[in-house]
Amino acid sequence: MSTLKEQLTAHVASYDHWAQRRRYGPDGHNNRSLWVLACMDERLPVDEALGIHVDTPAGGGDAHCFRNAGGIVTDDAIRSAMLTCNFFGTKEIVIVQHTQCGMLSGNANEMEKVLREKGMDTDNITLDPTLPELQLAKGAFAKWIGMMDDVDETCMKTINAFKNHPLIPKDIVVSGWVWEVENRRLRAPTLDKEKRARTDCTPTPYGVKGNQPPRWK
């Protein structure tokens, strides 16, 4: 039987490893070698949806988790995925989007119009003040916002974007899922509305007029 000193030494070492695990590169990966991209919405409980533990050091550590509006592919999502897949031992990417998403609730062209009325020049925006080289082409702002016409279609496009991106290794497993907030059910994305427990996964219930800029088509 080990002494208490030995047990405590191992216990402290485990916390040191936890705190410094990024220093180990691929050998310091998270518990499941997993990177999760999810919508930032508070109605999407990543741990419950995926059956893993992400959020707390006490019971977490299963994945790196990146959340943004919509859980969509963006330049910073690609940057984070590139780092975790190439340098931190990640072997799998899981994308989680959800029904009743706020990214369905408005038309991006109208949203840009509102910003212009507030005096913002959306044709001359520095996306990252520390990287002024990163610029949007004139007229691309509404598309950049990333509003959706259909959650399932967007989820499938996001999956393909990561599968085909040159900065993501080809052996990375990529999958995407839709969380139905109405009944707390996870399912695969589908264009067959008969296979959706809910069919109001489009902007129609919000009264959105006109299609979004063609980012996801």
Curated annotation (Swiss-Prot):
SUPFAM superfamilies: beta-carbonic anhydrase, cab. Gene3D superfamilies: Carbonic anhydrase. Pathway: Sulfur metabolism; hydrogen sulfide biosynthesis. Keywords: Hydrolase, Metal-binding, Zinc. Zn(2+) binds at residues 39, 98, 101. Its cofactor is Zn(2+). GO terms for biological process: hydrogen sulfide biosynthetic process. The keyword ATP-binding does not apply. It catalyses: carbon disulfide + 2 H2O = 2 hydrogen sulfide + CO2 + 2 H(+). Binds 1 zinc ion per subunit. One of its GO terms (molecular function) is hydrolase activity. Transmembrane segments: none annotated. Its EC number is 3.13.1.5. It is an enzyme of class 3 (hydrolase). Belongs to the beta-class carbonic anhydrase family. Catalyzes the conversion of carbon disulfide into hydrogen sulfide and carbon dioxide, with carbonyl sulfide as an intermediate. Likely plays a key role in sulfur metabolism that allows A.thiooxidans S1p to grow on carbon disulfide as the main carbon and energy source. Does not show carbonic anhydrase activity (hydration of CO(2) to carbonate). This is Carbon disulfide hydrolase.
